[in-house]
Amino acid sequence: MSTLDRHREPVLRQPSTAARVAGAGAGEPRPVTGGPHPLDAPALASLTGPHAHFAERRGRILRYPVDVTPWTAHPDAPDAQDWADLAALAGPGGTIGLNTLREEPPEGWEILQRVAGVQLVDESVVPEPDAEAVRLGPADVPEMLDLVERTRPGPFLPRTVELGTYLGIRRGGALVAMAGERLHPPGWTEISAVCTDESVRGQGLAGRLVRAVAYGIRERGETPFLHTSAANTGAIRLYEALGFRLRAHPEFLSLRAPAALPPTEEARKAALR
């Protein structure tokens, strides 16, 4: 695949994935560090790159607005100040999404959900526009949210549509399938919210929309990638058949912050004076 070659680290070549899977505050930013490859920390690469205008930041923690997407950028091994900054961004008792933590969260945090995932990259996808696909925008959000509620492809919120191009297919005027763009590390774009209504499943609409979204990404000279649950073997088989290949096994977590925020670094320093 030509575009992937420009960004490539070796793609894991192995049997089918589906077969195998049965102290600074907001005013004092600290350097944010991530993995050597943008897809090792895709939220960080997005929020410090093409999606920087969405970023809400405190210390080394960056997140998207709560009505855009749950993705949060954080160090591989958050320290006490990072957790304090996460709590401040989430708010007392608020929820926040993290990925692939090396250690369990500190006392006071509650893990609401832990999902084993897979990350796949375009290796040999044949992208092509789809004559039936239409561009979706803010006016379509109520229908998009309704389709997501029925099909559960993963998080899709009222402003997620602002992250990139979303395409849909309508039958009888009703939105029955969609897919679009979410995370945007430099040189890469994530395909997300791939879903089809039960009434039209088996007609190949999901594959058509993935290829159509991939076409727009490739036209920009970028490479598509995507995430899904490791348990979603049907989706993994589809993506592999389209030409995506396994790259990594991230873990996605949804956490609830402590009901009472920890003291800030400034407050701790003041108490010592």
Question: Which residue stretches match the model-derived regions?
Answer:
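N-terminal charged segments
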Residues: M1-P105
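Short amphipathic alpha-helix that is part of the acyltransferase structural core
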Residues: S2-L39, E123-G154, E265-R273
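A short, internal acetyl-CoA/4′-phosphopantetheine-binding micro-motif in the GNAT/acyltransferase core
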Residues: T72-P78, V194-R201
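Conserved acetyl-CoA-binding loop-helix of GNAT-fold acetyltransferases
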Residues: Q81-L86, G202-I217, I236-A241
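Conserved beta-strand-loop-alpha-helix junction that forms the acyl-donor binding cleft
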Residues: L98-R102, G216, F225-I236, F252-P262
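Conserved active-site alpha-helix within GNAT-family acetyltransferase domains
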Residues: E103-W109, G207, A230-A248
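Conserved catalytic-core motifs of GNAT/GCN5-like acyltransferases
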Residues: E110-D122, H227, R245-A259
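A conserved beta-strand-loop-helix scaffold within acyl/acetyltransferase catalytic domains
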Residues: P155-T165, I169-D197
